[in-house]
């Protein structure tokens, strides 16, 4: 059956389109509009809506296998579809760790029929221990799209060098969790005035940036493709900007909480505002916003990290790091468009086109013959995010009760409706 998305604003930066137009879909692909509309065609009237390539979140923790009490592939992809995402890349810090082809295959088999596509990311080191390399060829053959020890830094520079060399030989992307652990040890929020007032041990921005600089140096040495995860500070941005000027194969992401919140959110010892890297000051927040606009940062990803209530309802120092983000990312990111920081086309690049290119996966465009992964957005829809009504099992969000403007109203995966608001 032909599906017609009629009269929406089609924003497709890869094909340089930003115009009111119709999108036709059939058999899981985008097709060229026909002269006559078939009688059995399903038509959606989307006047006033944006029609964009399906959003892709390249940094998600689905917690499956092993920690399904926090999240599962089913609940995580349900939350993704509700947030407008047609695909997610899931991190390997599961139980067991995704460091073999068998775990990669389990994830892909369990994700069949899910509300969004799932792209497994394999571990850089066995067990995420940073001691020996994992089986890259085995994981790639099974379907892994990239490699990372996310959640843990690779402390050994020698091991990271070998990891990049091995990854390059298999044409695999390396994603870095950039953290110098001797500088961040026992820290639980940004080092600064707020931490001093609260009596909490801080984590300096240099704990992130010094490792970003190391990773960039090793990428230059090895020629490996490097992606810096969850960038939070000015110093990291400077290093990334310089790497790009030198033509190194380096890309980077940030998350909505880093351009929406500051470390003031921790006042009151709110554990829902605890994540790693931590929220920084207003100066860093503004720099992140500018870096999204000028191309220093390539991707908006959520770092969706669900936890159970008991893991957050403890004293701040002992609370788990991370927040859920799949259902708030789009609304928070659209604020950058309203503020004049981003154009709608640039936002689609950051949340769809560029993630697809970095991960070397299908999607990120609406050209004829492309997969029919499509997100429909109502940029004017005002709504209040309530964590109790969310689809994720995680209840850890500092945005609970926030009034947001703009949301996904329809999500299509391979031409099939996976979410309707």
From Swiss-Prot:
Chain positions recorded as Zn(2+) 1 binding sites:
59, 61, 150, 303
Q: Which GO terms describe its biological process?
A: 'de novo' UMP biosynthetic process; purine nucleobase catabolic process
Which residues does the Swiss-Prot or TrEMBL record annotate as the active site?
A: 303
Where does this protein act, in terms of pathway? Pyrimidine metabolism; UMP biosynthesis via de novo pathway; (S)-dihydroorotate from bicarbonate: step 3/3
User: Does Aminoacyl-tRNA synthetase count among this protein's keywords?
Assistant: no
Q: What is this protein called?
A: Dihydroorotase
Cofactor requirements of the protein: Zn(2+)
Which residues pair up as cystines?
none
Give the CDD domains listed for this entry: DHOase_IIa
Q: What is its EC number?
A: 3.5.2.3
Question: How many cofactor units bind, and how?
Answer: Binds 2 Zn(2+) ions per subunit.
By sequence similarity, the record places it as follows: Belongs to the metallo-dependent hydrolases superfamily. DHOase family. Class I DHOase subfamily.
Top-level taxon: Bacteria
- Protein purpose: Catalyzes the reversible cyclization of carbamoyl aspartate to dihydroorotate.
**Which cellular component appears as one GO term in the record?**
cytoplasm
Provide any one GO MF term from the record. Answer: allantoinase activity
UniProt keywords (A-Z) are: Hydrolase, Metal-binding, Pyrimidine biosynthesis, Zinc
In this chain, Zn(2+) 2 is annotated as bound at 150, 177, 230
Q: Which residues bind substrate?
A: 61-63, 93, 276, 307
* InterPro entries (UniProt xref): Amidohydro-rel, DHOase, DHOase/Allantoinase_Hydrolase, Dihydroorotase_CS, Metal-dep_hydrolase_composite, Metal_Hydrolase
Reaction(s) catalysed by this chain's protein: (S)-dihydroorotate + H2O = N-carbamoyl-L-aspartate + H(+)
Say if the entry is tagged with keyword Metal-binding: yes
């Amino acid at each position: 059956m032909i599906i017609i998305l009629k009269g929406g604003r089609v924003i497709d930066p890869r094909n340089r389109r930003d115009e009111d137009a119709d999108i036709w879909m059939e058999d899981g692909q985008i097709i060229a509009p026909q002269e006559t509309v078939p009688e059995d065609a399903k038509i959606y009237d989307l006047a006033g809506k944006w029609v964009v390539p399906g959003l892709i979140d390249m940094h998600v923790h689905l917690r499956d296998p092993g920690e399904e009490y926090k999240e599962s592939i089913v609940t995580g992809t349900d939350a993704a579809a509700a947030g407008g995402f047609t695909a997610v890349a899931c991190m390997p810090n599961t139980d067991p760790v995704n460091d073999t082809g068998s775990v990669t295959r389990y994830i892909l088999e369990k994700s069949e029929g899910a509300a969004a596509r799932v792209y497994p990311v394999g571990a850089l080191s066995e067990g995420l221990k940073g001691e020996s390399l994992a089986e890259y060829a085995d994981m790639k053959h099974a379907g892994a799209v990239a490699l990372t020890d996310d959640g843990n830094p690779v402390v050994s520079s020698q091991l990271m060098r070998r990891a990049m060399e091995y990854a390059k030989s298999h044409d695999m992307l390396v994603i870095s969790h950039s953290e110098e652990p001797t500088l961040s040890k026992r820290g639980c929020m940004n080092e600064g005035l707020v931490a001093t007032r609260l009596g909490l041990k801080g984590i300096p921005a240099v704990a992130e940036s010094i490792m970003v600089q190391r990773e960039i140096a090793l990428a230059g040495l090895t020629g490996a493709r490097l992606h810096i995860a969850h960038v939070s500070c000015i110093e990291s941005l400077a290093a990334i900007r310089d790497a790009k000027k030198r033509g190194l194969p380096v890309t980077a992401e940030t998350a909505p909480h880093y351009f929406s919140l500051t470390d003031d959110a921790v006042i009151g010892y709110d554990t829902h505002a605890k994540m790693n890297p931590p929220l920084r000051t207003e100066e860093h927040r503004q720099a992140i916003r500018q870096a999204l606009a000028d191309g220093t940062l390539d991707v908006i990803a959520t770092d969706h990290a669900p936890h159970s209530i008991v893991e957050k309802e403890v004293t701040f120092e002992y609370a788990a790091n991370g927040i859920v983000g799949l259902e708030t990312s789009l609304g928070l990111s659209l604020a950058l468009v309203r503020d004049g920081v981003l154009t709608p086309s640039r936002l689609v690049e950051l949340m769809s086109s560029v993630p697809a290119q970095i991960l070397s996966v299908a999607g990120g465009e609406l050209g004829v013959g492309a997969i029919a992964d499509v997100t429909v957005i109502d940029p004017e829809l005002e709504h209040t995010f309530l964590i109790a009504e969310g689809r994720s099992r995680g209840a850890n969000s500092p945005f609970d009760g926030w009034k947001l403007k703009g949301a996904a109203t329809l999500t299509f995966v391979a031409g099939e409706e996976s979410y309707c608001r």
